[in-house]
Design a protein with these regions (language model features):
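Transmembrane helices of ABC transporter permease
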Residues: 13, 17-29, 76, 143-197, ...
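Helix-loop-helix
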Residues: 161-175, 245, 249-318, 323-324
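Alpha-helical segments in transporter systems
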Residues: 16-41, 69, 73, 88-92, ...
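ABC-type nucleotide-binding domain
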Residues: 332, 339-594
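An intracellular "coupling" helix at the cytosolic face of ABC transporter transmembrane type-1 domains
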Residues: 12-13, 115-116, 132-141, 145, ...
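Juxtamembrane loop-to-helix connectors within ABC transporter transmembrane domains
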Residues: 2, 91, 111-155
Length: 594
């Protein structure tokens, strides 16, 4: 069986149920080994005309057959059925609970991992952990623990019975077993390695398929269906080859076990027949001995299956352990406080930041203050560091001490949950869940009423679009919201953030897909609905932020200027150049449309 720090706790947690299953297993194995004795009685009764029962020699009559053989056999079968049902419920039920608990632990750990982890590890690979690898662990925990105890208990009991009948014959029968044990150990190591390769190949295949399904529109637009099919075939072929290799090893192990069983039977028949010829065994005793050996055939087969399942289980557990051992880079420090009654002030104080895997500082000596109730725009060319500011405010990454303050308190002294709870966020990708529009808008507020959802949709200027849908707010969106337009996705995302009514609202380039008229309506609604609340708006178009209280202009990770639009246009040449270029682009676009 497999053991490890993430599995042992579940063995202990399910110990009472497993103990009950083990007791049922012991009962079944014990009474199962009574059956060969009845074989002896029947054979000797037929051959000799009499049987020895409890030290008494009795004539082999129908009454004796019924009383001492048939009725006890019926009771044995009934008890075996009850016992097997009981231990299956105990062992397999525990396996299901272990898998559920482990999957829940994985999910709980996954949600605490930093954004950097998800940038390195692909979704398809992670999903295979929750499906294939968890299923393997469940199979190993259920079937594996059953096989282990059944093979151990039944095998030892049967060997004891065989040893008492004739130890020399038993020693001869054990020689192939020792050889088989050595071969199985070597092959088990090889199977563990191959199973890890198999799971990784499946993960790569799943990840490739997931990316293709998500990006099918792009693939079709660039007419790359055939190219992607060829790439999929290559990965699928690799997956097939690894599976074939693993299957060959597993099949070879099964063949060797069968060879071992047949070899032992030959030994028993040969030497056992000799013992009968010598008069040391009678025919009934030889049949009884073979019955005991038949009882350990299952443990022998179970050993090969156990080697395979354990090899697979260890490989899957190693992959899951990598996830559970992944460090939680962004976490609360001991003794943090909750952010009580947040007002919405934000201050960056000489902050310099580099992404964990970055080669240069994306933000350099950033200092500015946002007072409660202010509406602030952050502009700059692509790569200037605008989104990095949002990442730090939302504590997606660790923040250097003494560089970021919310309501005058260092964010490192506040719980991450309370800081994020004080913010409402509209991300660049405008992610939507594959759920109804109502659930998407109400995601950030528990038990949001239909009236609240409708009001938020009106503020985001998307209500008219929603009511035009056949099912209105109950319209189910496709994966990541693919069934609505880019502008509708943005406005639904904005409605979701507005419904939360948080002290701090962050919009990361969140009106880029709407026209200027709709943009003006949304910005006017933001201004009227968020009086005395802080709004932070990251934008590429200057027209989006020019009416805000102040603008922070970033250039190559540094603050170039801070102030209202008119002031920056007059005092900052780089800002003025950006404004003029955008105006020229707008005018050129207008001429082209004309």
């Amino acid at each position: 069986m497999i053991f490890g720090k993430y599995i042992n706790r579940y063995y202990l947690k399910n110990a009472p149920v497993l103990l009950l299953g083990l007791l049922a297993l012991l009962m079944v194995d014990y009474i199962q080994l009574l059956i060969p004795q009845f074989y002896r009685l029947v054979i000797n009764g037929v051959n000799l005309g009499q049987v020895v029962v409890n030290g008494q020699t009795l004539p082999f009559t129908k009454e004796v057959l019924l009383q001492y053989i048939c009725l006890p056999m019926i009771w044995i079968v009934v008890l075996m059925v009850i016992g097997r049902f009981l231990w299956r419920i105990c062992f397999f039920g525990s396996a299901v609970r272990v898998a559920a608990n482990l999957r829940e632990r994985m999910f709980d750990h996954s949600r605490q991992l930093s954004q950097q982890y998800y940038q390195v590890n692909k979704v398809g690979n992670l999903m295979s952990l929750y499906t294939n690898d968890i299923d393997t662990i469940q199979e190993c925990f259920g079937d594996g623990i059953l096989m282990f105890f059944d093979a151990l208990v039944l095998g030892l009991m049967a060997l004891y019975k065989m040893w008492r009948m004739d130890y020399k014959l038993t020693l001869l029968a054990l020689i192939p077993a020792l050889i088989m044990f050595g071969i199985g150990t070597v092959m088990g190591t090889a199977m563990t390695k191959r199973w890890e390769e198999r799971q990784q190949a499946f993960s790569d295949l799943s990840d490739f398929a997931q990316e293709n399904f998500s990006g099918i529109a792009v693939i079709k637009a660039f007419v790359k269906e055939l190219k992607e099919l060829m790439a999929f075939r290559k990965l699928n072929k690799q997956n097939e080859e690894i599976n074939v290799i693993y299957t060959k090893i597993a099949t070879l192990l099964e063949v060797l076990v069968t060879l071992f069983v047949e070899s032992v039977i030959c030994v028993i028949l040969g030497y056992g027949g000799y013992l009968v010829y010598q008069g040391r065994f009678n025919a009934g005793q030889l049949v009884e001995y073979i019955g005991y050996f038949e009882a350990i055939v299952w443990p022998i087969i179970a050993i090969s299956m156990l080697i395979e399942k354990t090899s697979r289980g260890k490989a899957s557990l190693n992959r899951i352990t990598e996830l559970l051992n992944a460090p939680i880079d962004v976490a609360d420090r001991p003794g943090v406080q909750e952010l009580q009654n947040p007002q919405g002030s934000v201050e960056f104080r000489h902050l310099t930041f580099r992404y964990p895997d970055g080669e240069y500082d994306v933000l350099q000596d950033i200092s500015f203050t946002i007072h409660p109730g202010e509406s602030v725009g952050i502009v700059g060319k692509t790569g200037a560091g605008k989104t990095a500011l949002v990442d730090l405010l939302l504590r997606t990454y660790n923040v250097p001490d003494g560089t970021l303050f919310v309501d005058g308190k260092d964010v490192n002294t506040l719980s991450i949950h309370s800081v994020r709870a004080a913010c409402a966020y509209v991300p660049q990708d405008n992610f939507l869940f594959s759920d109804t529009i109502a659930h998407n808008i109400g995601f950030g507020v528990d038990d949001a009423s239909p009236e609240m959802i409708d009001h938020a949709a009106s503020l985001a200027d998307v209500r008219d679009n929603i009511v035009d849908f056949k099912d209105g707010y109950e319209t189910v969106l496709g994966e990541r919201g693919v069934t609505v337009s880019g502008g509708q996705k943005q406005r639904i995302s904005i409605a979701r953030a507005l419904l939360k009514a948080a002290p701090i609202l962050i919009l990361d380039d969140s009106v880029s897909a709407v026209d200027t008229r709709t943009e003006k309506i949304i910005l006017d609604n933001l201004k009227s609905s968020r009086a005395n609340k802080t709004t932070l708006l990251i934008a590429h178009r200057i027209s989006t932020v020019e009416r805000l209280d102040k603008i922070i202009f970033l250039d190559d990770g540094k603050i170039e200027a801070v102030g209202p639009h008119d002031e920056l246009y007059t005092s900052c040449p780089k800002y003025r150049r950006m404004v003029d270029l955008q105006r020229l682009e707008d005018e050129a676009g207008g001429d082209d449309n004309a």
